[in-house]
Swiss-Prot record:
GO terms for molecular function: translation initiation factor activity. It is found in: Cytoplasm. This is Eukaryotic translation initiation factor 3 subunit E. Component of the eukaryotic translation initiation factor 3 (eIF-3) complex. It comes from Pyricularia oryzae (strain 70-15 / ATCC MYA-4617 / FGSC 8958) (Rice blast fungus).
Length: 446
């Protein structure tokens, strides 16, 4: 008996990465993930819950997540939704007034210093030496350490209120002046989160680079702390990775660097899902074919190494296609991978690109070991009906200039594999060995 849709949904639920992701994100970064997860329990047209219990569970989770922040109006609305009331308790109005007063107090405490930092004649006298800058501001403008620290405190307060652009600006101003390395490091993480939540991807990438450098230098003598901080950064970097195409290559370079590959394998192997998807989906956009092939080989290598530690339909598709060469299993896993992508916050928008690219890779691998391919069977394996399959394969052969032709009368694709004699293969391998020997000899001669 075929499995029901409900049992299939339940089996795929085990691949939900939300519980793993939230452990490595700030509460404000968790919120978009929770919000997206809760949307699946509501009707898109009526906005009425389709699953009342699940919808309430997600609302409760959002309330618990944000109740300690200063986002008082939103938290009050969540309370009303949970309790089924129109008016929140008086404590929320009291907290709102308290937050407004604190905002005004912070404004007053930093107004003098922020005004100074807006003046050209002051900025022109600042140098890269923070100690000298503080001495100049203290001597010429009566600026104190407490006033600088107030920028940091106000930035944190604005962040707690959900005013992310304001928080980013305050934390930047603090970082320009402060000599407190621990707070400067915390401010950089805070500014990174603020830029992510503001959707300022260029700014986020600048901060991500600073955080990465800080981890490498400041925590050099503490490998355990380095591993923990790199684990956090790996998760935070998923936001620009899937939201800013211009940042993708730089981030992939980071992910595939030895330090971060080691971090993923040691601490968070589930990140393999995101690496596999972004690499495969980038097949058509890759400017450098060599770099793309290397990234794909790296993904395959890590999937093979980490199979005992982590697997899901995405990594199982990669394993079936490139490690086991099991095309039936790859065919089975691709639609499952597509379903997993549709419920993953970071991968929802890239699902179609992934499936299309995965079909291309499936076709390429399949064609390498078959001389004549049945169109109907291949269409089924690609998850397409016969007409869609024929059209898709015709377009692929045309676009990639694949040396193949379609025999519509027989319903087959005929591959033109060039014959390569054993003699020719020996010559090619000997050439490669001779070249490597020359390189080694030259290296030894130096």
């Amino acid at each position: 008996m075929a499995p029901s849709a409900e049992s299939e949904d339940n089996s795929l639920a085990q691949f939900d990465l939300l519980p793993k992701l939230v452990k490595n994100l700030d509460r404000h970064l968790i919120f978009p993930l929770l919000d997206a997860a809760s949307a699946q329990y509501y009707d898109e047209e009526t906005n009425e819950p389709r699953d009342v219990d699940k919808a309430r569970e997600m609302t409760k989770a959002k309330f618990e997540l944000l109740k300690k922040t200063n986002m008082t109006d939103y938290v009050a609305n969540l309370h009303c939704e949970l309790e089924g009331t129109d008016e929140p308790p008086a404590e929320y109005a009291e907290k709102r007034q308290k937050v407004i007063k604190q905002l005004q107090d912070f404004e007053d405490s930093v107004s003098k210093l922020r005004d100074l930092l807006d003046r050209e004649e002051v900025i022109s006298n600042l140098r890269s030496d923070k100690v000298a800058n503080l001495e100049f501001l203290k001597k010429e403008h009566d600026v104190t350490i407490e006033m600088v620290t107030a920028l940091y405190d106000f930035g944190n307060f604005q962040y707690s209120c959900g005013n992310y652009p304001a928080a980013a600006e305050l934390l930047y101003q603090f970082r320009v002046l402060s000599t407190d390395n621990d707070k400067v490091s915390a401010a950089t993480w805070g500014k990174l989160a603020s830029e992510i939540l503001s959707g300022n991807w260029e700014g986020a990438m600048e901060e991500l680079k600073k955080v990465r450098e800080d981890i490498d230098s400041r925590l050099f003598n503490n490998p355990l702390a380095q591993l923990q901080h790199r684990t956090w950064l790996t998760h935070w970097a998923l936001f620009p990775l899937f939201n800013d195409e211009n940042s993708r290559e730089a981030l992939l370079e980071m992910f595939f660097s030895p330090n971060y590959i080691n971090t993923i394998q040691t601490s968070c192997p589930w990140i393999l899902r995101y690496l596999a998807v972004v690499v495969i989906a980038g097949r058509g956009r890759a400017r450098n074919t060599g770099a793309y092939q290397k990234q794909l080989k790296d993904v395959v290598r890590i999937v093979k190494q980490e199979g005992y530690e982590y697997s899901d339909p995405v990594t199982d598709f990669v394993r079936a296609l490139y490690i086991d060469f099991d095309f039936e299993e790859a065919q089975r896993q691709l639609p499952r991978a597509e379903e997993v992508l549709r419920t993953d916050f970071f991968l929802m928008s890239i699902g179609d690109s992934f499936v299309d690219a995965a079909r291309h890779l499936f076709f390429e691998s399949y064609c390498k070991i078959h001389a004549r391919i049945d169109l109907k069977r291949l269409s089924e394996q690609l998850g397409l009906n016969v007409d869609e399959g024929e059209k898709w394969i015709v377009n692929l052969i045309r676009d990639t200039r694949l040396d193949a032709k379609i025999d519509f009368q027989e319903g087959t694709v005929v591959m033109n594999h060039p014959n390569s004699s054993v003699y020719q293969q020996v010559i090619e391998r000997t050439k490669g060995g001779f070249f490597r020997t020359q390189v080694l000899s030259a290296a030894v001669a130096r």
